[in-house]
């Protein structure tokens, strides 16, 4: 029976956030932001191991106590210049235990509000899927395309548009092959699409937000507090 593993690329600097440290280490309810991200994954009985892909020179990780997350957690200092490179390196680190037909969930370090229900939905809907898929939510807002002067150039129809989230879940062998061929993608689904396959969209939730700006951190704190 296929097993489930998770990879969390955490080598980014979070420059858009404008903080003194990478955003994955910013305080969120008394813990580093990434602690909450990893806690959601390590708490799942369906996930056997979680690899955190760090930058080779990351000075922040050793400053915190991660022991509460248990023995599933493993760090590898092989983060690359891009997300695709970091995930590919994480897949290589998993090669000693992962088989081609095992599932790999790739999850953003800066999505700390992933819930058990979201993971369960992903596992249930993709269990027998031939391709794999991603958590996503239908686009609710009206979309405007800007022109060169930052004026509205067009209003884009939102019918059928979804906003991609993570985790993104694909077979170990397939994902590795796709990323080897497609290095200029912004997410794993993009690599799968580039080799001619169609990932399934599994409805997520707006609370599964990605912390990108300071206001997002406050919102994530509200979401996590409400769950306690």
UniProtKB/Swiss-Prot annotation:
Gene3D superfamilies referenced in this protein's UniProt entry, alphabetically: Spore Coat Polysaccharide Biosynthesis Protein SpsA, Chain A
Glycosyltransferase is among the record's keywords: no
Pfam families to which the protein is assigned, alphabetical: IspD
Pathway membership: Isoprenoid biosynthesis; isopentenyl diphosphate biosynthesis via DXP pathway; isopentenyl diphosphate from 1-deoxy-D-xylulose 5-phosphate: step 2/6
GO molecular function terms noted in the UniProt entry: 2-C-methyl-D-erythritol 4-phosphate cytidylyltransferase activity
InterPro entries per the UniProt record, alphabetical: IspD (IPR001228), IspD/TarI (IPR034683), IspD/TarI_cytidylyltransf_bact (IPR050088), ISPD_synthase_CS (IPR018294), Nucleotide-diphossugar_trans (IPR029044)
Highest taxon in the source lineage: Bacteria
The enzyme's E.C. designation: 2.7.7.60
Tagged with keyword Transmembrane: no
Site keyed Transition state stabilizer: positions: 16, 23
Catalytic activity: 2-C-methyl-D-erythritol 4-phosphate + CTP + H(+) = 4-CDP-2-C-methyl-D-erythritol + diphosphate
Keywords, sorted A to Z: Isoprene biosynthesis, Nucleotidyltransferase, Transferase
Family: Belongs to the IspD/TarI cytidylyltransferase family. IspD subfamily.
HAMAP family: IspD
Purpose of the protein: Catalyzes the formation of 4-diphosphocytidyl-2-C-methyl-D-erythritol from CTP and 2-C-methyl-D-erythritol 4-phosphate (MEP).
Protein's recorded name: 2-C-methyl-D-erythritol 4-phosphate cytidylyltransferase
Species of the source: Dechloromonas aromatica (strain RCB)
Lineage, broadest ranks: Bacteria, Pseudomonadati, Pseudomonadota, Betaproteobacteria, Rhodocyclales
């Amino acid at each position: 029976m296929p097993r489930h593993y998770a990879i969390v690329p955490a080598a980014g600097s979070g420059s858009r956030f404008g903080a003194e440290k990478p955003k994955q280490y910013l305080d969120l309810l008394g813990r580093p932001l990434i602690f909450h991200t990893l806690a959601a994954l390590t708490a799942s009985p369906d996930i056997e191991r979680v690899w955190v892909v760090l930058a080779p020179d990351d000075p922040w990780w050793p400053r915190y106590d991660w022991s509460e997350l248990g023995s599933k957690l493993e760090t590898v200092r092989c983060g690359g210049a891009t997300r695709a490179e970091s995930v590919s390196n994480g897949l290589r680190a998993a090669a000693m235990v992962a088989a081609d037909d095992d599932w790999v969930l790739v999850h953003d370090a800066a999505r700390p509000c992933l819930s058990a229900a979201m993971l369960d939905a992903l596992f249930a809907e993709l269990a027998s899927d031939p391709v794999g898929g991603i958590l996503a939510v239908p686009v609710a807002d009206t979309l405007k395309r800007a022109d060169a002067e930052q004026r509205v150039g067009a209003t884009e129809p939102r019918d059928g548009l979804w906003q991609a989230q993570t985790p993104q879940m694909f077979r170990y062998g397939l994902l590795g092959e796709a990323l080897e061929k497609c290095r200029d993608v912004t997410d794993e689904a993009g690599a799968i699409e580039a080799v001619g396959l169609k990932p399934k969209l599994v409805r997520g939730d707006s609370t599964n937000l990605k912390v990108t700006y300071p206001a997002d951190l406050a919102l994530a704190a509200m979401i996590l507090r409400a769950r306690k």
